[in-house]
């Protein structure tokens, strides 16, 4: 049992709170003033800020090893590969997980890259553990889809389709139609006691998307690709997030309409790269969060690790605040907004009794880049403690 005392809480249910947190059995047991227990270890957070553990809403952590040429995030054998599963490639010993813990990041949504049009299943994982199966918060968390430069350029190099944006959308539509036909064949065989169709792992992986149990996680940068993503998703009435959404500030009315229908959120980032990427030429960097906020569009900020180091997630939010985004909104983008958009807010994203005890303690305002992460707690266990707390 742990009790965190004397800190300034930023619970994400209100802007700030002066109270203690009791942790028991890996969960937040209580948030009240003057908590005590004979059996509890006490953490004195005087002068510190206490937040929910930070959430990286789009990452490839564990699939791209820091400092290594190994890359397990893209499979170039087929542009339609929804059956791929991130958990089969995540390396818990990737040193980026330690970097995440040292910066207060407790959950990452990690998965396949953007080479394939439909690239496989993302997973929400905690950033501590030795076996990925023990780190899972939600699996699968989403199915990756990608539009734009990456799929057509990579497959053009192999003299294969897609070679154009038209082909990208067409191939995705065909895959979703195949999945519908596969579902219909299963339902018909069950209804008539007939023979089941041969098992198809790719189509099977898309069934939860068609039933709206799982969202598509759609990689998009250009405004026209954003429009195509919305168009195709609405044609098949599937849920989705728009990830990166680099030119989203140019089509805010489209985004607002999409959020009313099937889009469950916008995930922006990385905010510190892509300087040489043609389709991100209109990138507005740290002004992007403010542009969406001013239009009333909720969003999360991601690192897109390996593109940005995961330990810079908080820095990206803080630099967005420096561009005029209210600090509280910046923190929401890497806590509760990230949790809501990725479908894990029942477990993480805010400091509430009953939620997972994933907590970060900072030396000062977390939206001040000079503040340091002092302690990180995951599932009630201290997984990082700064050696010099001053």
Task: Say what each PLM segment does.
Residues 86, 183-285, 300, 340-342, ...:
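Active-site core of metal-dependent hydrolases
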Residues 7, 21, 26, 47, ...:
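Divalent metal-coordination and catalytic microenvironments
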Residues 9-52:
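Histidine-rich, glycine-flanked metal-binding segment
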Residues 66, 71-76, 81-84, 215, ...:
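His/Asp/Glu-enriched, well-ordered alpha-helical/loop segment
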Residues 101-240:
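Polyanionic/metal-chelating signatures
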Residues 5-11, 340, 352-390:
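C-terminal cap of metal-dependent C-N hydrolases
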